[in-house]
Structure formats: C-alpha cells, structure tokens
C-alpha cells in the first residue's frame, strides 16, 4: 500500500469547466510541489479545456 509521503503519488485531473474527473496520472512531488494544471481534452465538453489536480 502506498504511503502518504510517496514521491510519485497518483493524482486525479478534473476539468475546470464541467468538473468531471477525466484523467489519472502521476507526478513527482519534489519537482512539482504545487497543484498541476494542464490543457487536456475533455470528453464531456468535447474540446480542450484546462484540467487541474484535485485532492
């Protein structure tokens, strides 16, 4: 089981427009300590939207 201080935790990316959680990815906490934000395709909206890391 993964510990809470894992260097590469799994994170969920949610669309900022419709709030759907579309993507699951990993990130390195040492290189990116703050929340990740990427432009990805949202299937619910049907276009590229900004996706932000959720907790």
Swiss-Prot record:
Record gene name: rpmG
Signal sequence annotation: none
GO cellular component: cytoplasm; ribonucleoprotein complex; ribosome
Protein family: Belongs to the bacterial ribosomal protein bL33 family.
GO molecular function, a single term: structural constituent of ribosome
GO biological process: translation
Entry keyword set: Ribonucleoprotein, Ribosomal protein
Bilayer-crossing regions: none
HAMAP family: Ribosomal_bL33
Keyword check for Hydrolase: no
Keyword Cell membrane (UniProt): no
PROSITE patterns: RIBOSOMAL_L33
NCBIfam families for the chain: PRK00504.1, PRK00595.1, rpmG_bact
Pfam families reported in the protein's UniProt record: Ribosomal_L33
Protein name: Large ribosomal subunit protein bL33
Annotated disulfide bonds: none
PANTHER family referenced in this protein's UniProt entry, alphabetically: 50S RIBOSOMAL PROTEIN L33, CHLOROPLASTIC, LARGE RIBOSOMAL SUBUNIT PROTEIN BL33C
């Amino acid at each position: 089981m993964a510990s809470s201080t894992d260097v590469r935790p799994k994170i969920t990316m949610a669309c900022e427009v419709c709030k759907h959680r579309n993507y699951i990815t990993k990130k390195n906490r040492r290189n990116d300590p703050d929340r990740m934000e990427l432009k990805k395709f949202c299937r619910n909206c049907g276009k590229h939207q900004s996706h932000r890391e959720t907790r």
